[in-house]
């Protein structure tokens, strides 16, 4: 039996949508674009500035995914969490961005911000492809061109893969990036929604300690989220072609997985030289153990090697 679920403001969906349904994009507002697979929501890409009542005005942000949904319609991500207002679903930002003798903070959105410029590709059918051009701006000055590609594969019985490519190009002047001192965060980040029974699994195991400045090819967070009858979660896989593979991470059991590249050691990039970063976000039903995660990472490696 199918039941109605609340998915997005003003939008309802039927549970139990069939695997193999086609993807479609749908505007949520003049600021946000939703992706659906059949009757099931996949994510919302917020490309214009999002604000929240009661939150300091300088926490306004754009260029991130939230909500990101599990396979049963549960919301996996959080936005404007009270403990870290600047956290924003699935996002990519650096706390130290230096150029032209000045330093900016994309992570805390201080002095610089990411801005949407144009859609490059928006295709939906048996799979979905979204390619966006953004800019990093310090006031009116654009310092980095950012191209984001999201390739979403059809849901399988118990998982879904979202491939992400970030291409960053410094413009007039060199740009130096660095992660947070003593922690390494800075780069792709996934902030999870409130949940219970959290387990973070990496190739090092699934202990309860947080991992700062730790080199990993992948990390997963599994838990019980509101709206789901069983545990679920999401992993981030890093492409073997990634610079300095495996990169540093920061994992936190309060609910965040943070890539840390280039990590605590700053790296300078010259104008017009592109930086290419590839990842897969692997969403799954049930808690994922190390064996299942290793197998899914192997599938990702093979897909990259064959171009599929």
Predicted features and spans:
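Beta-strand-rich recognition/accessory modules
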Residues: 234-308
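Trp/Gly-enriched beta-strand surface patches
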Residues: 184-263, 268
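Extended, loop-rich substrate-binding clefts of extracytoplasmic carbohydrate-active enzymes
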Residues: 85-158
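Beta-strand-rich N-terminal accessory domains
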Residues: 21-86, 165, 178-180, 294
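Cleavable N-terminal signal peptides
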Residues: 7, 18-19
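Beta-strand elements of well-folded, non-transmembrane domains
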Residues: 134-138, 150-154, 168-172, 192-196, ...
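Acidic (Asp/Glu-rich), glycine- and aromatic
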Residues: 45-48, 56-58, 155-201
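Sec-dependent signal peptide recognition
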Residues: 2-10
């Amino acid at each position: 039996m199918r039941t109605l679920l609340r998915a997005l403001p003003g939008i309802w969906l039927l549970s139990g949508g069939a695997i193999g349904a086609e993807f479609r994009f749908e505007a949520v507002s003049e600021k946000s674009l939703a992706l659906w697979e059949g009757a099931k929501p996949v994510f919302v890409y917020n490309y214009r500035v999002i604000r929240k009542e009661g939150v300091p005005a300088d926490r306004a942000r754009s260029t991130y995914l939230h909500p990101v949904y599990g396979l049963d319609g549960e919301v996996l991500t959080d936005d404007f969490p009270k403990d870290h207002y600047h956290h924003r679903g699935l996002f990519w930002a650096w706390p130290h961005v230096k150029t032209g003798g000045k330093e900016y903070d994309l992570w805390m959105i201080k002095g610089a911000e990411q801005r949407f410029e144009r859609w490059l590709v928006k295709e939906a059918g048996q799979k979905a492809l979204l390619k966006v051009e953004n800019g990093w701006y310090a006031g009116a000055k654009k310092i980095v061109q950012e191209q984001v590609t999201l390739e979403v594969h059809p849901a399988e019985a118990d998982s879904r893969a979202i491939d992400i490519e970030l291409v960053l190009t410094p413009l007039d002047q060199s740009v130096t990036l660095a992660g947070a001192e003593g922690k390494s965060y800075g780069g792709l980040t996934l902030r999870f929604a409130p949940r219970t029974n959290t387990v973070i699994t990496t190739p090092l195991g699934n202990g309860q300690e947080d991992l700062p400045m730790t080199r990993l090819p992948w990390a997963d967070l599994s838990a019980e989220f509101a709206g789901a009858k069983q545990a679920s979660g999401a992993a981030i896989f890093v492409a073997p072609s990634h610079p300095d593979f495996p990169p540093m991470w920061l994992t936190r059991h309060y609910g965040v997985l943070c890539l840390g590249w280039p990590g605590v050691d700053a790296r300078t990039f010259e104008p017009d030289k592109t930086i290419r970063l590839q990842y897969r976000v692997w969403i799954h039903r049930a808690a994922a153990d190390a064996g299942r995660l290793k197998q899914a990472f192997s599938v990702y490696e093979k897909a990259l090697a064959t171009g599929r």
